[in-house]
Amino acid sequence: SYHTTGGYLEETICNRLDRCQDQVHKFLAPFRELFPFGADYRHDQLHLRKELSPEQRRTEPRNADSHLTFIGSGLENCVTYPSNPSRPVFFIDLDGINKDNRDRRERTTTVIGYNDERVVDDVELEVPVSTHPIDSISLRDPRLGIFDQLHELLAERGIKQGRVEISLARDESHAG
């Protein structure tokens, strides 16, 4: 998914839900209750959001509830499933219809089929964090240079298509 209010459940979660659409809905229901639409979320105070143009402020949905449900329920932007035509892969769209004006969103997703995967490199990169106890860092921030380093590694190895997996170090404590 190219948007953080639509995504996929990891295969292991789908297996625990018997790959059943009704079970997926039941799984998501408590998160929708925990993060109700229309609560006083700062994200939904569009007049305060400096990153939005005036046109975007007129059309942007109030969807903090969907973002929080996405995060809280463990939805993913990218998942890997073994190919099995009899088993569903659920795309879960949490705000495909703008709750304010009933406009429908269009979604785009990418499916990549492959029959081979091999690790080309395993690199540790440092991510600076602030002194605040709760922090969020954009790995795409050009000041960090992380994506520049990744692109350099891919270019050095001649990789034009593939998958980059980013995760915390195994010995990382007090995280995740």
Which residues make up each language-model segment?
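Active-site histidine-anchored catalytic micro-motif
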Residues: 1-176
